[in-house]
UniProtKB/Swiss-Prot annotation:
UniProt entry keywords in alphabetical sequence: Chloroplast, Electron transport, Heme, Iron, Membrane, Metal-binding, Photosynthesis, Photosystem I, Photosystem II, Plastid, Thylakoid, Transit peptide, Transmembrane, Transmembrane helix, Transport
Sequence positions that bind heme: 150, 170, 173-174
Anything else known: This polypeptide is nuclear encoded in Euglena gracilis, but is chloroplast encoded in other plant species.
Name assigned to this protein: Cytochrome f, chloroplastic
Gene: petA
The organism's place on the tree of life at top rank: Eukaryota
Cofactor binding note from Swiss-Prot or TrEMBL: Binds 1 heme group covalently.
PROSITE patterns found in the cross-reference section: CYTF (PS51010)
Segment annotated as transit peptide: 1-149
Main function: Translocates protons across the thylakoid membrane and transfers electrons from photosystem II to photosystem I. It receives electrons from the Rieske iron-sulfur protein and passes them to plastocyanin.
Assembly: Interacts with plastocyanin and Rieske iron-sulfur protein.
Topology term for the membrane: Single-pass membrane protein
Amino acid sequence: MASLQTPVMVGTVVGCVAGVVGFLAMSSNAATSLSVAPASTSTQIIANPSVIAPQYQGSVTSEDVAMEASQTDFAEVAEISSPVQVQSWSMIFSAMLAVPLAAAAMFFMKKSTTEERRPLVSIDDLLSVGKKAVVASAVVGAAAGSANAYPIFAQQAYGNPREATGRIVCANCHLASKPTEIEVPQAVLPDQVFEAVTKVPFSGPSGFFNVVDPSTVVGSVTFAGTQPVGFIQESGVPVSQALVDIATPGTPDTVFKATIKVPYDESLKQVAGNGRAAPLNVGAVLILPEGFRLAPPERIPEKMKEEINGLQFIQYSKDTPNILVVGPVPGKKYAEMTVALLSPDPRVDKKAEFGTLPIYVGGNRGRGQLYPTGEKSNNNIYNVEHSGKIADIQLNEKKRIYTVAVQQKDGEIINEDLPAGAELIVKVGDVVEAGQAISTNPNVGGFGQAESEIVLQNPGRVQAFLFFSFTVLATQTLLVVKKKQYEQVQLSEMNF
Protein backbone atom coordinates (compact mmCIF):
# COMPACT_ATOMS: atom_id res chain seq x y z
CA MET A 1 0.00 0.00 0.00
CA ALA A 2 1.24 3.44 -0.86
CA SER A 3 2.45 5.58 1.99
CA LEU A 4 1.80 9.26 2.12
CA GLN A 5 4.91 11.42 1.93
CA THR A 6 5.74 14.11 4.46
CA PRO A 7 4.64 17.08 2.25
CA VAL A 8 1.29 15.40 1.68
CA MET A 9 0.78 14.82 5.40
CA VAL A 10 1.76 18.40 6.20
CA GLY A 11 -0.53 19.72 3.46
CA THR A 12 -3.42 17.61 4.73
CA VAL A 13 -2.97 18.85 8.31
CA VAL A 14 -2.73 22.48 7.20
CA GLY A 15 -5.78 21.99 4.97
CA CYS A 16 -7.78 20.64 7.91
CA VAL A 17 -6.74 23.63 10.00
CA ALA A 18 -7.83 25.95 7.17
CA GLY A 19 -11.20 24.22 7.06
CA VAL A 20 -11.66 24.59 10.83
CA VAL A 21 -10.68 28.26 10.66
CA GLY A 22 -13.11 28.80 7.80
CA PHE A 23 -15.85 27.17 9.85
CA LEU A 24 -15.03 29.43 12.80
CA ALA A 25 -15.26 32.45 10.50
CA MET A 26 -18.77 31.39 9.57
CA SER A 27 -19.96 30.42 13.05
CA SER A 28 -18.60 33.57 14.68
CA ASN A 29 -20.99 35.60 12.56
CA ALA A 30 -24.03 34.02 14.20
CA ALA A 31 -24.25 36.60 16.96
CA THR A 32 -26.56 39.44 16.10
CA SER A 33 -27.28 42.81 17.60
CA LEU A 34 -30.31 45.06 17.54
CA SER A 35 -28.38 48.17 18.49
CA VAL A 36 -29.03 51.30 16.47
CA ALA A 37 -25.41 51.64 15.38
CA PRO A 38 -22.20 49.60 15.87
CA ALA A 39 -20.26 50.56 18.96
CA SER A 40 -17.23 51.42 16.83
CA THR A 41 -19.11 54.09 14.87
CA SER A 42 -18.49 57.66 16.03
CA THR A 43 -20.92 60.14 14.51
CA GLN A 44 -21.91 63.75 14.97
CA ILE A 45 -25.65 63.91 14.34
CA ILE A 46 -26.93 66.67 12.09
CA ALA A 47 -30.70 66.79 11.56
CA ASN A 48 -31.38 69.63 9.17
CA PRO A 49 -34.46 68.95 7.00
CA SER A 50 -33.36 71.50 4.41
CA VAL A 51 -30.18 69.60 3.53
CA ILE A 52 -30.80 67.12 0.75
CA ALA A 53 -27.64 65.10 1.33
CA PRO A 54 -26.89 65.08 5.08
CA GLN A 55 -23.29 65.73 5.99
CA TYR A 56 -22.01 64.14 9.18
CA GLN A 57 -18.56 63.82 10.61
CA GLY A 58 -16.91 60.92 12.35
CA SER A 59 -15.34 57.60 11.55
CA VAL A 60 -17.79 56.85 8.71
CA THR A 61 -16.10 57.95 5.46
CA SER A 62 -17.07 57.69 1.83
CA GLU A 63 -14.60 54.82 1.43
CA ASP A 64 -16.30 52.97 4.28
CA VAL A 65 -19.67 53.58 2.69
CA ALA A 66 -18.48 52.37 -0.71
CA MET A 67 -16.94 49.27 0.84
CA GLU A 68 -20.13 48.61 2.77
CA ALA A 69 -22.17 48.99 -0.39
CA SER A 70 -19.99 46.51 -2.27
CA GLN A 71 -20.45 43.94 0.50
CA THR A 72 -24.10 44.49 1.24
CA ASP A 73 -25.55 44.68 -2.25
CA PHE A 74 -25.41 40.92 -2.70
CA ALA A 75 -28.71 40.42 -0.98
CA GLU A 76 -29.02 36.71 -1.59
CA VAL A 77 -26.17 35.86 0.80
CA ALA A 78 -27.80 37.76 3.64
CA GLU A 79 -29.38 34.77 5.37
CA ILE A 80 -29.90 36.61 8.62
CA SER A 81 -31.95 36.31 11.75
CA SER A 82 -32.07 40.06 12.21
CA PRO A 83 -31.48 42.97 9.82
CA VAL A 84 -28.41 44.23 11.67
CA GLN A 85 -25.41 42.00 12.31
CA VAL A 86 -22.17 43.02 13.96
CA GLN A 87 -18.79 41.65 12.90
CA SER A 88 -16.75 40.04 15.66
CA TRP A 89 -12.97 40.06 15.97
CA SER A 90 -12.90 36.27 15.89
CA MET A 91 -14.65 36.28 12.51
CA ILE A 92 -12.24 38.85 11.08
CA PHE A 93 -9.08 37.01 12.23
CA SER A 94 -10.50 33.64 11.18
CA ALA A 95 -11.34 34.92 7.72
CA MET A 96 -7.86 36.46 7.37
CA LEU A 97 -6.16 33.20 8.37
CA ALA A 98 -8.28 30.86 6.26
CA VAL A 99 -6.90 31.85 2.84
CA PRO A 100 -3.14 31.78 3.67
CA LEU A 101 -3.56 28.43 5.41
CA ALA A 102 -5.32 27.06 2.35
CA ALA A 103 -2.52 28.38 0.11
CA ALA A 104 0.11 26.73 2.33
CA ALA A 105 -1.79 23.44 2.22
CA MET A 106 -1.89 23.49 -1.58
CA PHE A 107 1.86 24.33 -1.69
CA PHE A 108 2.77 21.28 0.39
CA MET A 109 0.44 19.05 -1.59
CA LYS A 110 2.01 20.22 -4.84
CA LYS A 111 5.40 18.96 -3.68
CA SER A 112 4.16 15.40 -3.39
CA THR A 113 5.25 12.83 -5.99
CA THR A 114 2.94 10.48 -7.84
CA GLU A 115 2.89 6.97 -6.43
CA GLU A 116 2.80 4.17 -9.02
CA ARG A 117 1.05 1.63 -6.86
CA ARG A 118 -2.51 2.61 -6.03
CA PRO A 119 -4.51 1.25 -3.09
CA LEU A 120 -8.27 0.77 -3.16
CA VAL A 121 -8.66 4.55 -3.06
CA SER A 122 -6.31 6.55 -5.28
CA ILE A 123 -4.07 9.01 -3.45
CA ASP A 124 -4.33 11.39 -6.41
CA ASP A 125 -8.10 11.34 -6.08
CA LEU A 126 -7.81 12.05 -2.36
CA LEU A 127 -5.45 14.95 -3.05
CA SER A 128 -7.79 16.38 -5.70
CA VAL A 129 -10.79 16.20 -3.40
CA GLY A 130 -8.74 17.58 -0.52
CA LYS A 131 -7.57 20.57 -2.53
CA LYS A 132 -11.12 21.38 -3.58
CA ALA A 133 -12.35 21.08 0.00
CA VAL A 134 -9.54 23.30 1.30
CA VAL A 135 -10.22 26.00 -1.29
CA ALA A 136 -13.97 25.84 -0.71
CA SER A 137 -13.65 26.10 3.07
CA ALA A 138 -11.19 28.97 2.82
CA VAL A 139 -13.31 30.92 0.36
CA VAL A 140 -16.45 30.42 2.42
CA GLY A 141 -14.66 31.41 5.59
CA ALA A 142 -13.14 34.52 4.06
CA ALA A 143 -16.37 35.58 2.41
CA ALA A 144 -18.47 35.13 5.54
CA GLY A 145 -19.52 38.67 6.39
CA SER A 146 -22.35 40.48 8.06
CA ALA A 147 -25.36 42.12 6.43
CA ASN A 148 -25.26 45.73 7.50
CA ALA A 149 -28.46 47.73 7.25
CA TYR A 150 -28.71 50.92 5.22
CA PRO A 151 -31.24 52.51 7.64
CA ILE A 152 -28.28 53.12 9.91
CA PHE A 153 -27.35 56.03 7.63
CA ALA A 154 -30.65 57.78 8.33
CA GLN A 155 -30.52 56.81 12.00
CA GLN A 156 -27.17 58.51 12.39
CA ALA A 157 -28.17 61.73 10.66
CA TYR A 158 -31.80 62.30 11.66
CA GLY A 159 -33.64 62.12 14.93
CA ASN A 160 -36.92 61.60 13.06
CA PRO A 161 -37.11 60.00 9.61
CA ARG A 162 -40.08 62.19 8.63
CA GLU A 163 -39.19 65.80 7.92
CA ALA A 164 -41.37 68.78 8.73
CA THR A 165 -42.42 68.89 5.08
CA GLY A 166 -43.75 65.34 5.33
CA ARG A 167 -41.00 63.79 3.24
CA ILE A 168 -39.28 60.68 4.57
CA VAL A 169 -35.51 61.14 4.61
CA CYS A 170 -34.82 57.95 2.63
CA ALA A 171 -35.68 60.05 -0.43
CA ASN A 172 -32.48 62.04 0.14
CA CYS A 173 -30.38 59.13 -1.14
CA HIS A 174 -32.93 57.17 -3.20
CA LEU A 175 -33.64 59.82 -5.81
CA ALA A 176 -35.80 57.74 -8.16
CA SER A 177 -39.50 57.87 -7.37
CA LYS A 178 -41.48 54.64 -7.21
CA PRO A 179 -45.03 54.04 -5.96
CA THR A 180 -45.75 52.75 -2.48
CA GLU A 181 -49.14 51.76 -1.13
CA ILE A 182 -50.44 50.89 2.31
CA GLU A 183 -53.67 49.33 3.52
CA VAL A 184 -54.68 49.22 7.16
CA PRO A 185 -57.87 48.24 9.00
CA GLN A 186 -60.41 51.02 9.33
CA ALA A 187 -60.34 50.78 13.13
CA VAL A 188 -58.75 48.82 15.96
CA LEU A 189 -59.36 48.55 19.68
CA PRO A 190 -56.78 49.15 22.42
CA ASP A 191 -54.36 46.31 23.09
CA GLN A 192 -55.12 44.72 19.72
CA VAL A 193 -52.98 43.44 16.87
CA PHE A 194 -54.01 44.55 13.36
CA GLU A 195 -52.72 44.08 9.82
CA ALA A 196 -51.35 46.77 7.53
CA VAL A 197 -50.37 45.92 3.95
CA THR A 198 -47.72 48.08 2.33
CA LYS A 199 -47.03 47.51 -1.36
CA VAL A 200 -43.88 48.75 -3.04
CA PRO A 201 -44.24 47.83 -6.72
CA PHE A 202 -41.10 47.65 -8.82
CA SER A 203 -40.69 48.87 -12.38
CA GLY A 204 -37.90 48.34 -14.85
CA PRO A 205 -36.83 46.19 -17.79
CA SER A 206 -35.04 42.89 -17.44
CA GLY A 207 -31.47 42.20 -18.45
CA PHE A 208 -27.98 41.74 -17.05
CA PHE A 209 -27.55 45.30 -15.84
CA ASN A 210 -31.15 46.32 -16.56
CA VAL A 211 -30.16 49.50 -18.32
CA VAL A 212 -32.88 52.15 -18.30
CA ASP A 213 -32.84 55.03 -20.74
CA PRO A 214 -33.70 58.30 -18.92
CA SER A 215 -36.49 59.03 -21.40
CA THR A 216 -38.03 55.56 -21.17
CA VAL A 217 -41.07 55.15 -18.94
CA VAL A 218 -42.06 51.61 -18.14
CA GLY A 219 -44.92 50.27 -16.11
CA SER A 220 -44.93 48.25 -12.92
CA VAL A 221 -45.10 44.48 -12.90
CA THR A 222 -45.66 43.16 -9.39
CA PHE A 223 -44.86 39.81 -7.84
CA ALA A 224 -45.77 38.20 -4.52
CA GLY A 225 -42.97 35.71 -3.96
CA THR A 226 -42.60 34.13 -7.38
CA GLN A 227 -46.23 34.49 -8.44
CA PRO A 228 -47.49 37.55 -10.34
CA VAL A 229 -50.35 39.45 -8.72
CA GLY A 230 -53.01 41.69 -10.21
CA PHE A 231 -52.10 44.93 -11.94
CA ILE A 232 -53.74 47.68 -13.96
CA GLN A 233 -52.69 48.20 -17.58
CA GLU A 234 -52.70 51.25 -19.77
CA SER A 235 -52.27 50.64 -23.52
CA GLY A 236 -51.06 47.15 -22.75
CA VAL A 237 -48.41 48.37 -20.30
CA PRO A 238 -48.82 47.56 -16.59
CA VAL A 239 -48.83 50.84 -14.69
CA SER A 240 -49.94 50.05 -11.16
CA GLN A 241 -50.81 47.18 -8.89
CA ALA A 242 -54.42 46.44 -8.08
CA LEU A 243 -55.52 46.46 -4.46
CA VAL A 244 -55.05 43.23 -2.58
CA ASP A 245 -57.68 42.07 -0.11
CA ILE A 246 -56.54 41.80 3.47
CA ALA A 247 -57.84 39.79 6.38
CA THR A 248 -60.15 41.34 8.94
CA PRO A 249 -58.65 42.40 12.29
CA GLY A 250 -58.33 39.83 15.03
CA THR A 251 -60.25 39.71 18.25
CA PRO A 252 -59.84 42.66 20.65
CA ASP A 253 -57.57 40.74 23.03
CA THR A 254 -55.01 39.67 20.41
CA VAL A 255 -51.94 41.17 18.82
CA PHE A 256 -52.31 42.52 15.28
CA LYS A 257 -49.82 42.27 12.48
CA ALA A 258 -48.59 44.56 9.73
CA THR A 259 -47.66 42.86 6.48
CA ILE A 260 -45.39 44.94 4.27
CA LYS A 261 -45.36 43.65 0.70
CA VAL A 262 -42.51 44.64 -1.59
CA PRO A 263 -43.29 42.89 -4.89
CA TYR A 264 -40.90 43.23 -7.81
CA ASP A 265 -39.67 41.32 -10.83
CA GLU A 266 -37.09 38.89 -9.44
CA SER A 267 -35.36 38.65 -12.82
CA LEU A 268 -34.12 42.23 -12.42
CA LYS A 269 -30.56 42.85 -11.25
CA GLN A 270 -28.94 45.95 -9.83
CA VAL A 271 -25.37 47.17 -10.08
CA ALA A 272 -23.53 46.49 -6.83
CA GLY A 273 -20.84 48.73 -5.37
CA ASN A 274 -18.13 46.69 -7.11
CA GLY A 275 -19.87 46.86 -10.49
CA ARG A 276 -21.21 43.33 -10.51
CA ALA A 277 -24.84 42.43 -11.10
CA ALA A 278 -26.61 41.59 -7.85
CA PRO A 279 -30.16 40.78 -6.73
CA LEU A 280 -32.24 43.64 -5.41
CA ASN A 281 -32.63 44.36 -1.72
CA VAL A 282 -35.84 45.71 -0.24
CA GLY A 283 -36.46 47.80 2.85
CA ALA A 284 -39.15 49.80 4.57
CA VAL A 285 -39.74 52.35 7.30
CA LEU A 286 -43.05 52.34 9.15
CA ILE A 287 -44.06 55.39 11.18
CA LEU A 288 -46.91 54.46 13.51
CA PRO A 289 -49.02 56.75 15.71
CA GLU A 290 -47.73 57.55 19.17
CA GLY A 291 -48.04 54.56 21.49
CA PHE A 292 -48.11 51.85 18.81
CA ARG A 293 -45.15 49.48 19.07
CA LEU A 294 -43.79 46.04 18.33
CA ALA A 295 -45.75 43.26 19.97
CA PRO A 296 -44.04 41.39 22.82
CA PRO A 297 -42.88 37.90 21.75
CA GLU A 298 -45.15 36.21 24.28
CA ARG A 299 -48.21 37.86 22.72
CA ILE A 300 -47.45 36.71 19.17
CA PRO A 301 -49.42 33.62 18.06
CA GLU A 302 -47.50 30.69 16.59
CA LYS A 303 -49.12 31.13 13.19
CA MET A 304 -48.00 34.74 13.06
CA LYS A 305 -44.47 33.74 14.05
CA GLU A 306 -44.35 31.49 10.99
CA GLU A 307 -45.47 34.38 8.80
CA ILE A 308 -42.75 36.61 10.27
CA ASN A 309 -40.21 34.05 9.01
CA GLY A 310 -37.39 35.13 11.32
CA LEU A 311 -37.40 38.75 10.13
CA GLN A 312 -36.88 41.27 12.91
CA PHE A 313 -37.87 44.89 12.65
CA ILE A 314 -35.91 47.28 14.84
CA GLN A 315 -36.77 50.60 16.43
CA TYR A 316 -35.51 53.66 14.63
CA SER A 317 -34.06 54.80 17.95
CA LYS A 318 -34.50 53.96 21.61
CA ASP A 319 -36.75 57.00 22.04
CA THR A 320 -39.07 56.16 19.12
CA PRO A 321 -40.67 52.75 19.66
CA ASN A 322 -43.42 53.71 17.20
CA ILE A 323 -40.97 54.09 14.27
CA LEU A 324 -39.74 50.82 12.81
CA VAL A 325 -37.20 50.06 10.09
CA VAL A 326 -36.12 46.93 8.28
CA GLY A 327 -33.65 46.26 5.52
CA PRO A 328 -31.96 45.90 3.30
CA VAL A 329 -33.06 42.28 3.21
CA PRO A 330 -33.08 39.84 0.28
CA GLY A 331 -36.07 40.54 -1.92
CA LYS A 332 -36.40 36.90 -2.95
CA LYS A 333 -36.84 35.78 0.64
CA TYR A 334 -38.71 38.78 2.02
CA ALA A 335 -40.92 39.95 -0.83
CA GLU A 336 -43.61 39.98 1.86
CA MET A 337 -42.55 41.21 5.29
CA THR A 338 -44.77 40.68 8.32
CA VAL A 339 -44.40 42.46 11.64
CA ALA A 340 -46.50 41.95 14.75
CA LEU A 341 -47.73 45.22 16.28
CA LEU A 342 -49.62 46.16 19.42
CA SER A 343 -52.05 49.05 19.69
CA PRO A 344 -51.87 51.21 22.85
CA ASP A 345 -54.45 51.76 25.55
CA PRO A 346 -54.79 55.53 26.11
CA ARG A 347 -56.26 54.85 29.55
CA VAL A 348 -52.84 53.51 30.54
CA ASP A 349 -50.49 55.23 28.08
CA LYS A 350 -51.11 58.96 28.41
CA LYS A 351 -49.15 59.71 25.21
CA ALA A 352 -51.64 57.78 23.12
CA GLU A 353 -55.07 59.09 22.24
CA PHE A 354 -58.29 57.79 20.77
CA GLY A 355 -59.48 58.95 17.38
CA THR A 356 -58.32 58.96 13.76
CA LEU A 357 -54.54 58.67 13.58
CA PRO A 358 -52.12 58.85 10.61
CA ILE A 359 -49.74 56.10 9.52
CA TYR A 360 -46.80 56.83 7.22
CA VAL A 361 -44.77 54.31 5.29
CA GLY A 362 -41.77 54.47 3.01
CA GLY A 363 -40.47 51.62 0.91
CA ASN A 364 -37.46 51.20 -1.33
CA ARG A 365 -36.00 48.61 -3.58
CA GLY A 366 -32.43 48.61 -4.81
CA ARG A 367 -29.54 50.92 -3.95
CA GLY A 368 -29.58 54.67 -3.60
CA GLN A 369 -27.93 57.27 -5.80
CA LEU A 370 -26.22 59.22 -3.01
CA TYR A 371 -24.18 58.27 0.02
CA PRO A 372 -24.86 60.08 3.31
CA THR A 373 -21.66 62.07 2.71
CA GLY A 374 -23.27 63.61 -0.38
CA GLU A 375 -21.10 61.68 -2.84
CA LYS A 376 -22.69 59.89 -5.78
CA SER A 377 -22.82 56.11 -5.84
CA ASN A 378 -22.12 54.11 -8.98
CA ASN A 379 -25.88 53.62 -9.35
CA ASN A 380 -26.14 56.79 -11.46
CA ILE A 381 -25.89 58.13 -14.99
CA TYR A 382 -22.36 59.46 -15.51
CA ASN A 383 -22.09 62.97 -16.96
CA VAL A 384 -18.78 63.88 -18.58
CA GLU A 385 -17.00 66.75 -16.83
CA HIS A 386 -15.13 68.20 -19.83
CA SER A 387 -16.07 69.15 -23.37
CA GLY A 388 -14.15 67.76 -26.32
CA LYS A 389 -13.65 64.74 -28.52
CA ILE A 390 -13.36 61.21 -27.15
CA ALA A 391 -9.85 60.12 -28.08
CA ASP A 392 -9.69 56.74 -26.37
CA ILE A 393 -11.69 54.34 -24.20
CA GLN A 394 -10.03 51.80 -21.91
CA LEU A 395 -11.76 49.11 -19.82
CA ASN A 396 -10.32 47.71 -16.61
CA GLU A 397 -12.05 44.32 -16.67
CA LYS A 398 -11.00 43.45 -13.14
CA LYS A 399 -12.47 46.60 -11.59
CA ARG A 400 -15.17 46.99 -14.28
CA ILE A 401 -14.20 50.64 -14.75
CA TYR A 402 -14.11 52.54 -18.04
CA THR A 403 -11.50 55.27 -18.53
CA VAL A 404 -12.52 57.80 -21.17
CA ALA A 405 -9.88 60.12 -22.65
CA VAL A 406 -11.39 63.47 -23.69
CA GLN A 407 -9.30 65.65 -26.02
CA GLN A 408 -10.11 69.32 -25.52
CA LYS A 409 -9.88 72.05 -28.16
CA ASP A 410 -6.39 73.06 -27.02
CA GLY A 411 -5.20 69.48 -27.53
CA GLU A 412 -5.00 68.59 -23.84
CA ILE A 413 -6.24 65.08 -23.06
CA ILE A 414 -8.05 64.53 -19.78
CA ASN A 415 -8.90 61.05 -18.52
CA GLU A 416 -12.19 60.52 -16.73
CA ASP A 417 -12.91 57.31 -14.80
CA LEU A 418 -16.50 56.14 -14.85
CA PRO A 419 -18.04 54.40 -11.81
CA ALA A 420 -17.77 50.64 -11.61
CA GLY A 421 -20.37 48.85 -13.69
CA ALA A 422 -21.26 51.80 -15.95
CA GLU A 423 -22.16 50.99 -19.56
CA LEU A 424 -21.01 53.52 -22.17
CA ILE A 425 -23.33 54.96 -24.81
CA VAL A 426 -20.54 56.80 -26.66
CA LYS A 427 -17.61 55.65 -28.77
CA VAL A 428 -14.21 56.90 -29.84
CA GLY A 429 -14.53 59.94 -32.06
CA ASP A 430 -17.76 61.26 -30.55
CA VAL A 431 -17.87 64.92 -29.55
CA VAL A 432 -19.28 65.53 -26.07
CA GLU A 433 -20.21 68.59 -24.07
CA ALA A 434 -19.58 69.10 -20.37
CA GLY A 435 -22.48 67.67 -18.40
CA GLN A 436 -23.57 65.32 -21.18
CA ALA A 437 -24.57 61.79 -20.15
CA ILE A 438 -22.18 59.22 -21.58
CA SER A 439 -23.48 56.14 -19.76
CA THR A 440 -26.78 54.37 -19.34
CA ASN A 441 -28.85 54.67 -16.19
CA PRO A 442 -28.20 51.49 -14.18
CA ASN A 443 -30.77 52.30 -11.51
CA VAL A 444 -33.71 49.90 -11.46
CA GLY A 445 -34.86 50.74 -7.94
CA GLY A 446 -36.37 53.69 -6.17
CA PHE A 447 -38.20 54.97 -3.13
CA GLY A 448 -41.81 55.83 -2.51
CA GLN A 449 -43.94 56.80 0.44
CA ALA A 450 -47.62 56.76 1.28
CA GLU A 451 -49.89 57.47 4.20
CA SER A 452 -53.13 56.16 5.57
CA GLU A 453 -55.36 56.53 8.62
CA ILE A 454 -56.45 54.20 11.36
CA VAL A 455 -59.05 54.74 14.06
CA LEU A 456 -58.20 53.75 17.61
CA GLN A 457 -61.64 53.12 19.03
CA ASN A 458 -62.59 53.95 22.60
CA PRO A 459 -64.24 50.82 24.04
CA GLY A 460 -66.45 53.06 26.19
CA ARG A 461 -67.79 54.77 23.09
CA VAL A 462 -68.41 51.43 21.42
CA GLN A 463 -70.25 50.17 24.49
CA ALA A 464 -72.25 53.40 24.69
CA PHE A 465 -73.15 53.09 21.02
CA LEU A 466 -74.26 49.50 21.49
CA PHE A 467 -76.29 50.48 24.56
CA PHE A 468 -77.87 53.36 22.63
CA SER A 469 -78.67 51.09 19.68
CA PHE A 470 -80.20 48.49 22.01
CA THR A 471 -82.24 51.18 23.76
CA VAL A 472 -83.55 52.55 20.46
CA LEU A 473 -84.39 49.05 19.26
CA ALA A 474 -86.15 48.21 22.53
CA THR A 475 -88.07 51.50 22.49
CA GLN A 476 -89.21 50.96 18.93
CA THR A 477 -90.25 47.41 19.74
CA LEU A 478 -92.23 48.55 22.79
CA LEU A 479 -93.90 51.28 20.75
CA VAL A 480 -94.99 48.72 18.16
CA VAL A 481 -96.29 46.43 20.88
CA LYS A 482 -98.10 49.31 22.57
CA LYS A 483 -99.62 50.34 19.25
CA LYS A 484 -100.94 46.83 18.74
CA GLN A 485 -102.46 46.89 22.23
CA TYR A 486 -104.09 50.26 21.53
CA GLU A 487 -105.54 48.96 18.29
CA GLN A 488 -106.98 45.96 20.13
CA VAL A 489 -108.62 48.26 22.67
CA GLN A 490 -110.12 50.38 19.90
CA LEU A 491 -111.52 47.30 18.19
CA SER A 492 -113.05 46.06 21.44
CA GLU A 493 -114.74 49.44 22.08
CA MET A 494 -116.17 49.45 18.55
CA ASN A 495 -117.78 46.05 19.19
CA PHE A 496 -119.79 47.49 22.09
